[in-house]
Curated annotation (Swiss-Prot):
It comes from the Bacteria. One of its GO terms (cellular component) is cytosol. Keywords: Cytoplasm, Magnesium, Metal-binding, Nucleotidyltransferase, RNA-binding, Transferase. PROSITE patterns: KH_TYPE_1 (PS50084), S1 (PS50126). This is Polyribonucleotide nucleotidyltransferase. Transmembrane segments: none annotated. One of its GO terms (biological process) is mRNA catabolic process. GO terms for molecular function: 3'-5'-RNA exonuclease activity; magnesium ion binding; polyribonucleotide nucleotidyltransferase activity; RNA binding.
Length: 752
């Protein structure tokens, strides 16, 4: 965009052999009536407009900062018309809601404390390269427009996504990766922070292992995202954050409005705090040694009523200040006990985990279910399986158009013993569900290995600290109970941080498995999920201006010890996938030639509809010729497969058919036998006993050899079309005849 009124600055992000990215900040041309507005470009083909405005007067009766952050995804940005009935954008997509949360979390702590004027930040996606991720650009755009607005905001705040991308020269942390680059990365994380002296203080982290990370690590030898590697990624993000902050500061120095004096409403005055502290501090220390949450809350509420009543006459009309001061004194008492005595609210040490309970198959008829309990936090996980055509269709600016694994998180008000609204999910519930989903996606089987759409629901039945990480554990249990062949079990833990001045020094204490109160009174909520080998998801929020990376690195190591302990509990409840529930649909895959798709469908769908009607199966066909067959039972699915093969694959073997095959390979567990060109089956070592007069076979080569002809019968075809074989011995052949054999030579002449 051009014009004499435009002022700009640029941040050049150098990724070495992966090239450079240019982030350009502009102001002065668009949205001139907003308090602050900025256009932000990445490489000139993705553009976002951020506008920050503030209410003229403080909101009456508000005891919190009313900040609203919104993202408007315009489909014209990608050259598309919305797919809704009215062909117009409606409610925000899940991606937009998650982007709002990414922006809100680092920005909110940067506003002056006590601000009660409404502040709204709106980021509109005006143009986007389909290969770009706009969410991290939006963090910088919202920070830039807020800096320009004249609001009491201690920015700038820079945000960057870094991905551990592998190529022939090794792995490197790449800033602002594209969607296509993420396919070759094992881990990516969004890191937001601010410049603090000569360093960068980290304010927010959102990280995940990628969908393809397991294959890249196990099959291609890529670097696994261990705690040490993740810590290196946090350090790698710092120079990029500094470059972004410097560019914002440069433009703000030239174009920002003078900071406006807004009325600030402190929660209490010093005289109120001193009176409450004198009346309540010693008693609070005793109250917060009660381990049970409900007993502790009851005692705390009673003490609060006692203190406010006794001081009401002294501070008439200042009841709200008394209540706020009581909370602040409570916070100070709890934090000082942790830092000085290394003892927490419920009497645990800093690294102690509450009692854990894991149980599977807790509901009848559902496909998979489990309950995971950590102290008073109780999560029920429920898994539902269906055909792939039931996967979620996505209409957003992302190139991802469908999602096979859907994770929904519900947080009813009774989970904390309260009343409240029940209905559509709020942003918090959407965010928690997305976090649990990201933690589990890396260990899910591929579509080919497990051709099912998977819906996982986490019900928070009781809450006292980290229901999102409890959801990860419950989901692992539930999916294994449903028969989902996870590549590894995943567990999650929430870490906390308390920092304060003790004897003139700043001390940090990292807490394992935080309570709800420790989350409220602490400085950090740091959630880490992963397998026994590596990290799969991270979420960090802080109330401080930033946290040293060294403190986060230590917390990561502490979280790993807790995660391994939780995984032991999960494995003791269930360590391998169960059989599919009798109530779950049976989904099998058949591969047919692409030029046969029309024949299977038939004119106006006549053939496929007839097969579905005759067998009771549900059939869907992919463009590559993969046919997915779903049915309520195995015989229906097998009947549909036979009908499809009769049309498209007339030479495809079926159960019970006999072949004179040729041994093409021997292994320690059996021999592979070629039945027809391109179609092999496994003759397991346990079946070879029939060829050795019933004797145990220890060495396959002692019974059969490559090139030998063997008469076999197909005994099983699994969901992926793999064939299991059994040898046909002379007695069976003589008794039953060879009328079903598909041999090119008479069965009697076969040399075994």
């Amino acid at each position: 965009m051009e014009g004499p009124e435009i002022q700009f600055s640029e941040a050049v992000i150098d990724n070495g052999r992966f090239g450079k990215r240019v982030i350009r900040f502009e102001t002065g041309r668009l949205a001139k009536q907003a308090a602050g507005a900025a256009m932000v470009y990445i490489d000139e083909d993705t553009a976002l407009l951020s506008a920050t405005t503030a209410g003229k007067h403080p909101r009456e009766g508000f005891d919190f900062f009313p900040l609203t952050v919104d993202v408007e995804e315009r489909m014209y940005a990608a050259g598309r018309i919305p797919g809704s009935f009215f062909r117009r954008e409606g409610r925000p997509s899940t991606e937009a809601i998650l982007a709002c949360r990414l922006m809100d979390r680092p920005l909110r702590p940067a506003f002056v404390k006590g601000l009660r004027n409404e502040v709204q930040i709106v980021v509109t996606v005006l143009a986007i390269n389909p290969d770009e991720l706009y969410d991290v650009v939006a963090i910088n755009a919202s920070s830039m427009s807020t800096q320009l607005s004249g609001l009491p905001f201690s920015g700038p705040i820079g945000g960057v996504r870094v991905a551990l991308v592998a190529d022939e020269n090794g792995s490197q942390w790449v800033a602002f990766p594209k969607h296509s680059q993420l396919e070759n990365s094992v881990f990516n994380m969004v890191v937001a922070g601010r410049v603090a002296g000569d360093d960068v203080a980290i304010m927010m982290v959102e990280a995940e292992a990628t969908d393809n990370s397991w294959n890249l690590i196990k099959e291609q030898g890529a670097t696994a995202p261990t705690e040490e590697v993740v810590s290196e990624g946090l350090e790698a993000a710092k120079p990029f954050i500094k470059a972004l902050c410097d560019a914002q500061a440069d433009l703000a120095a030239r174009a920002a409005k003078p900071t406006v004096e807004f009325p600030v409403f402190l929660d209490y005055q010093d005289d109120v705090y001193a009176a409450v502290e004198a009346a309540a501090a010693d008693k609070l220390a005793a109250v917060f040694q009660i381990a049970d949450k409900q007993e502790r809350d009851t005692a705390s509420d009673a003490l609060k009523d006692e203190v406010t009543s006794s001081l009401a006459g002294q501070f008439e009309g200042r009841e709200k200040e008394l209540s706020a001061a009581f909370r602040s004194v409570t916070k100070h008492v709890v934090r000082q006990r942790i830092l000085k005595d290394q003892i927490r609210i419920d009497g645990r040490g800093l690294t102690d985990i509450r009692q854990l309970t894991a149980e599977v198959e807790v509901l009848p008829r559902v496909h998979g279910s489990a309950i995971f309990e950590r102290g008073e936090t109780q999560i029920m996980g429920v898994t539902t399986l269906n055909m792939l055509k039931m996967e979620q269709q996505i209409d957003s600016l992302s190139p991802v158009t469908r999602k096979r694994y859907m994770h929904n998180y519900n947080f009813p008000p009774y989970s904390t013993g309260e009343t409240g609204r029940v209905g559509s999910p709020k942003r918090r519930e959407i965010g928690h569900g997305a976090l649990a989903e990201r933690a589990l996606v890396p260990v899910l089987p591929s579509r080919e290995e497990f051709p099912y759409a998977i819906r996982q629901v986490s019900e928070a039945l009781g809450s006292n600290g980290s229901t999102s990480m409890g959801s990860v554990c419950a989901s692992t249990l539930s999916m294994l109970n449903a028969g989902v062949p996870l590549k590894a079990a995943v567990a999650g833990i929430a870490m906390g941080l308390v920092s304060d001045q003790v004897d003139g020094q700043t001390r940090y204490a990292a807490l394992t498995d935080i309570l709800g109160a420790e989350d409220a009174f602490g400085d950090m909520d740091f959630k880490v999920a992963g397998t026994s080998e590596f990290v799969t998801a991270i979420q960090l929020d802080t109330k401080l201006d930033g946290i040293p990376a060294s403190v986060l690195a230590a917390a990561l190591k502490q979280a790993r010890e807790a995660r391994l302990h939780i995984l032991e509990v999960i494995n003791s409840a269930i360590d391998t996938p169960d059989e599919l529930s009798e109530f779950a649909p049976r989904v099998i895959a058949v591969k047919i030639p692409v030029d046969k798709i029309g024949e299977v469908i038939g004119p106006k769908g006549k053939m496929i509809n007839q097969i579905q009607e005759d067998t009771g199966a549900d059939i869907s066909i992919e463009d590559d010729g993969t046919v997915y067959i779903g049915a309520t039972n195995g015989p229906s699915a097998d009947a549909a497969r036979s009908a499809i093969n009769a049309i498209a694959n007339p030479q495809v073997p079926e159960i019970g058919e006999r072949y004179l095959g040729t041994v093409v390979k021997t292994t320690t567990f059996g021999a592979f036998v070629s039945l027809t060109p391109g179609k092999d089956g496994l003759l397991h070592i346990s079946e070879l006993r029939k060829l050795a007069n019933g004797k145990r076979v220890d060495n396959v080569d002692d019974v059969v050899s490559v090139g030998q002809k063997v008469q076999v019968e197909i005994t099983k075809i699994d969901d992926r079309g793999k064939l299991s074989l059994s040898p046909v011995v002379a007695e069976e052949e003589g008794a039953e005849g060879a009328e079903r054999a598909h041999a090119t030579e008479p069965a009697e002449g076969a040399e075994i």
